[in-house]
Each structure stands twice: as structure tokens, then as C-alpha cells.
């Protein structure tokens, strides 16, 4: 099956504005609400209380119930960790998520988020890999928000994404018949404070 350009991206998370606060939630169509069927739990309980059921069957059913409860708990823990990570990203990039201006992205690496949430860097990497977030200004890939920092002429640390954006703007505005040389690009970016 070939890729179709008009395929929609279904986000994993949603960021919304509530006054000055940014709210983060899971996109519920992507996550199932899991629970153990109440009538099945009652059947297991009744079987455990029954003297007519052999010990091996009772143990088997108890083990299956415990496994199901563990699975539901693990999924809830995973969702909780995912939300903590994305909330930390939104907090670190508050201005960007509020305004949607790429120039407001601050340098941020996986380690920053991992330390803030209290998880391993690999956990943050797995949570943000191939995950999308819907924002008031569009849907974006979470990993694209992570950038290294570069110190500009004023001594401020800025995101390398800001510099990439500035280069793209300069190249878009140049005469395509006579593109800028590398030295000219450096001079133009230097004039802009980079």
C-alpha cells in the first residue's frame, strides 16, 4: 500500500490553552480505557469461595486475575509517565507552546526532561519517538522540539532550530539565479545577531 499525501496524523497528546495555563492530555481515541470485566471478577471470586472447584483451578483463575490486574496497572502507569514527560516538555517550552513561534523554542535535550520528571533518558526517548502532539497552532512531532543550544553574539543561549529557521528565511528570500555564497550567509546571519 502506497503512502497517500493526504493522510491525517492522529496525535498522541493534546495541548490546549485554559487562560494562561497550558493543559496536556492523552488523545483518547489513541488510548483505550482498560478495566477488568466485573462479572468475570465476580465469577473468579465465587469460584474461590466454592468448595466444588478444585485447588488447581482456583489457583489458575487467581493467577489470571492477578496478571490482568497487573497489566491494567502497567498501562495506567505508562500513561501517567507519558503525561509527566509531555507536561515537562510543555513547561520547559511554555512560550513556544503558547505562541507557536519557532523562534521561541529554547534549547532542550532529553536529559533536561528526564531530570525534571525523574526517569531515565531512554524513557523520555521512547515516549517522544514517533509521537505527535496537537497544539492550537498545529500538530507536530515531539522529537522536533528537542534542540541543542548555541550561544549568539549577545551571549544568550538560543536553540539551533532558531538558527535553522533564520537560514531558511534568508535562502527563501535570496535571488534564485544568484544564490548567496557561504560567506554572504555568514555575514547576513551575523547582522541578525547569530
How should each PLM-predicted stretch be described?
Residues 1-194:
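Alpha-helical scaffold/interaction cores of sigma-54-like transcription cofactors
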Amino acid at each position: 500500500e502506497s503512502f497517500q499525501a493526504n493522510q491525517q496524523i492522529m496525535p498522541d497528546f493534546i495541548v490546549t490553552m485554559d487562560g494562561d495555563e497550558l493543559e496536556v492530555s492523552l488523545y483518547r481515541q489513541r488510548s483505550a480505557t482498560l478495566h477488568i470485566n466485573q462479572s468475570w471478577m465476580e465469577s473468579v471470586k465465587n469460584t474461590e469461595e466454592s468448595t466444588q472447584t478444585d485447588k488447581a483451578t482456583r489457583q489458575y483463575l487467581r493467577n489470571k486475575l492477578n496478571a490482568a490486574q497487573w497489566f491494567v496497572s502497567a498501562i495506567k502507569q505508562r500513561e501517567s509517565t507519558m503525561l509527566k514527560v509531555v507536561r515537562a516538555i510543555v513547561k520547559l517550552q511554555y512560550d513556544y507552546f503558547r505562541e507557536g513561534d519557532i523562534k521561541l523554542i529554547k534549547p532542550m535535550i532529553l536529559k533536561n526532561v528526564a531530570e525534571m520528571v525523574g526517569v531515565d533518558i531512554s524513557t523520555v526517548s521512547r515516549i517522544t519517538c514517533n509521537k505527535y502532539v496537537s497544539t492550537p497552532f498545529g500538530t507536530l512531532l515531539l522529537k522536533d522540539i528537542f534542540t541543542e543550544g548555541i550561544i549568539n553574539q549577545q551571549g544568550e543561549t538560543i536553540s539551533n532550530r532558531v538558527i535553522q529557521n533564520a537560514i531558511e528565511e534568508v535562502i527563501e528570500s535570496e535571488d534564485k539565479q544568484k544564490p548567496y555564497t557561504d560567506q554572504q550567509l555568514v555575514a547576513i546571519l551575523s547582522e541578525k545577531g547569530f
